[in-house]
């Protein structure tokens, strides 16, 4: 098997959907017995610090479709790209708003998905 360069790999990843990338990461973690969680530096409490202000930053987000707008067909296409849903399931999701499109995804992935849906004319919330 030919060895792929980093640029070749990145080009392949750019062509994948978020769902495909998520499945790839899971398979990679299982194959090599690693986790993709980022290392988090742990800091001690601040001297004279504010009590109970150590609420962790949210790391999982839901992308909620709140309305399809006037370009419903475009929104259905984007929903299908973001998920592994078929045409009927994607249409039902768009028709039944408000509904979650993606659940428990990273902030960056949620923002990208929201941008794609907004560009197609949908109204979206990221929670």
Swiss-Prot record:
Keywords: Ribonucleoprotein, Ribosomal protein. It comes from the Bacteria. Disulfide bonds: none annotated. GO terms for molecular function: mRNA binding; structural constituent of ribosome. CDD domains: Ribosomal_L7_L12 (cd00387). GO terms for cellular component: cytosolic large ribosomal subunit. InterPro entries: Ribosomal_bL12, Ribosomal_bL12_C, Ribosomal_bL12_C/ClpS-like, Ribosomal_bL12_oligo, Ribosomal_bL12_oligo_N_sf. GO terms for biological process: translation. It holds the Pfam family Ribosomal_L12. Forms part of the ribosomal stalk which helps the ribosome interact with GTP-bound translation factors. Is thus essential for accurate translation. HAMAP family: Ribosomal_bL12. Belongs to the bacterial ribosomal protein bL12 family. Homodimer. Part of the ribosomal stalk of the 50S ribosomal subunit. Forms a multimeric L10(L12)X complex, where L10 forms an elongated spine to which 2 to 4 L12 dimers bind in a sequential fashion. Binds GTP-bound translation factors. This is Large ribosomal subunit protein bL12. The lineage of its organism: Bacteria, Bacillati, Actinomycetota, Actinomycetes, Kitasatosporales.
């Amino acid at each position: 098997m030919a060895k792929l360069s980093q640029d070749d790999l990145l080009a392949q990843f750019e062509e994948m959907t978020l769902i495909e990338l998520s499945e790839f990461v899971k398979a990679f973690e299982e194959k090599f017995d690693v986790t993709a969680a980022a290392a988090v530096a742990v800091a001690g409490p601040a001297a004279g610090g504010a009590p109970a202000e150590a609420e962790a930053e949210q790391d999982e987000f839901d992308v909620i479709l709140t309305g399809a707008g006037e370009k419903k067909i475009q929104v259905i296409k984007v929903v299908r790209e973001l998920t592994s849903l078929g045409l009927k399931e994607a249409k039902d999701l768009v028709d039944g708003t408000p509904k979650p499109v993606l659940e428990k995804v990273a902030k960056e992935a949620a923002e990208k998905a929201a941008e794609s849906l907004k560009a197609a004319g949908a109204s979206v919330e990221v929670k």
